[in-house]
Amino acid sequence: MAATRNLSLLAQSSQPWAGIYGSHGSPRPISSWLRRQSIAKTSYICMCTPLSMSQLIATPLITDIESLLKYLRQPQVLPHEIDDSTKRRELLERTRRELQTTLEPLQAMKMIDTLQRLGLAYHFEDDINSLLTGFSNGQPDEDLLTASLRFRLLRHNGHRINPNIFQKFMDKQGKFIDSLKEDTRGLFSLYEASYLGANGEDILLQALEFTKAHLKESLPSLAPPLAKKVSQALELPRHRRMARLEARRYIEEYGGENGHSPDLLELAKLDYNKVQSLHQLELSEISRWWKQLGLVDKLTFARDRPLECFLWTVGILPEPKYSSCRIELAKTIAILLVIDDIFDTHGTLDELILFTNAIRRWDLEAMEDLPEYMRICYMALYNTTNEICYKILKQNGWSVLPYLKATWIDMIEGFMLEASWLNTGYVPNMEEYVENGVTTAGAYMALVHLFFLIGQGVTEENVKLLVKPYPKLFSYSGRILRLWDDLGTAKEEQERGDLASSIDLFMRENNITSDEEGRKCILKIIDNLWKELNGELVSRHALPLAIIKAAFNMARASQVVYQHEEDSYFSSVDNYVQALFFTPFN
């Protein structure tokens, strides 16, 4: 980052949300209260698995906006209307009847699990929740596989269940019965369930250690199909997988399973292709917006990654019903990348201070003192945020500008803090770095925007949680994002002279000299953060379930985006984009 040593222009900011709260009381719908807030007028100045090796990508490589728009204009790719075929509707109704009439609990749970893995569960949310409510109390004679599957499904879907159900599989010394290691499928089910454990749930920690050791030991002797499943789960358990990538991978795998349903496989492929067509419509809108915005034409140093931005939104919000939310979130992420590049690679310190103060003021006159390239970025942020606020106002009658604006101010101040650290040579401790890094990674910004864009379960009481200090749920998810970002990009950022990463800071504070050991320690910290995150799912939370799921999905997407390894579960972002958005099933 180009910088001078003049810090005198950096003014202290006041909290932009001061005075916007009413009296405390019981939670109530927030519509009338939010309508009292003001909204600025908009001014206009004018992106879990790789494809199988045997499956060819039948689409051209998408390298820039022009090639993307050209591809999306093809009528066979982007139809005028998305066809909802009679066959697909028939298969959906047939599946619904089967789900509703399956009486045996284990078979019903297996069907729910399969629907979720294939990406079809969103069609049957009410039926699934009704069934899961009935599974809250297990049977005294249920085996390890059944108990573990029941636990995982209930907790994953936000239902309360106590891990003490596994005590029946332990001996008098409080250890898991040794004979369980002969039940490979039961062990596998318990292994997957153990990853939903929260801090303090020692029985699940013990279950993880017990199952992981025995599954690794038994891996060489397992039949190939089961061995592949176990190997992939040891690398990335189900609980941490990105939903749409898991659907892609499992659809490819499901047809080879004994006893699979041909109807369900056909439905999964038809539905995947339909959702892919929806994603192409969304990409078309985002790409046209990005091209019209013209940021990277004027700011040639900035990243041009609408496809990657959209991949993030599909990871965070996989359900088709959130189409408009994905579009708006992708816009904010794209602008965030440009601002990050301004602070990291282009702006002088004096310019960054001017930009920070202009964002704090949040009015058009504030940009008069900015250099031209910053004015363009400022207007893009100003207009886009106000447009999002206007859409929320039209849809729900809520005026949310104070909240969205505050997240951008927090983030810009976080970037400015990092710039001052780099300029003065200050080395933060790891906690300082990570806490600020959650802000600059955009975690708080994205989740606060989504809270209002999703618009479910919004009350005056839970809106009060959306300011500093942000909810722990947001912080845990954001810390996982920050740490995975560092694991994936630390080397490149160090080469261009950026701040030390969390890996470097942790190694320095703990006298670690091996990079490999340092990375392993960061992975352990991520594991502990997942336990904290799971605790938010267990607790009775004031935030709506939809935003809780979005926070979990952000953590899931961060590992998929930043961990790329050959010959493993993980692949490159380009492969994910091709598989999700441009390669339909036959």
From Swiss-Prot:
List of residues binding Mg(2+) 1: 340, 344
EC annotation from Swiss-Prot or TrEMBL: 3.1.7.11
The keyword Plastid appears for this protein: yes
Subcellular location: Plastid, Chloroplast
Main location, first listed in the record: plastid
A cellular-component GO term for this protein: chloroplast
Transit peptide: 1-47
Chloroplast found in the keyword field: yes
Keywords: Chloroplast, Hydrolase, Magnesium, Metal-binding, Plastid, Transit peptide
Cofactor field: Mg(2+)
Binding residues for Mg(2+) 2: 340, 344
Binding site for Mg(2+) 3: 485, 489, 493
Family matches, as Pfam families: Terpene_synth (PF01397), Terpene_synth_C (PF03936)
Cofactor: record remark: Binds 3 Mg(2+) ions per subunit.
Pathway the protein takes part in: Secondary metabolite biosynthesis; terpenoid biosynthesis
SUPFAM superfamilies xrefs: Terpenoid cyclases/Protein prenyltransferases (SSF48239), Terpenoid synthases (SSF48576)
Listed GO MF terms: hydrolase activity; magnesium ion binding; terpene synthase activity
GO biological process terms held by the UniProt record: diterpenoid biosynthetic process
Family note: Belongs to the terpene synthase family. Tpsg subfamily.
Identification of the protein by name: Monoterpene synthase TPS4, chloroplastic
UniProt source species: Cananga odorata
Lineage of the organism: Eukaryota, Viridiplantae, Streptophyta, Embryophyta, Tracheophyta
The gene coding this protein: TPS4
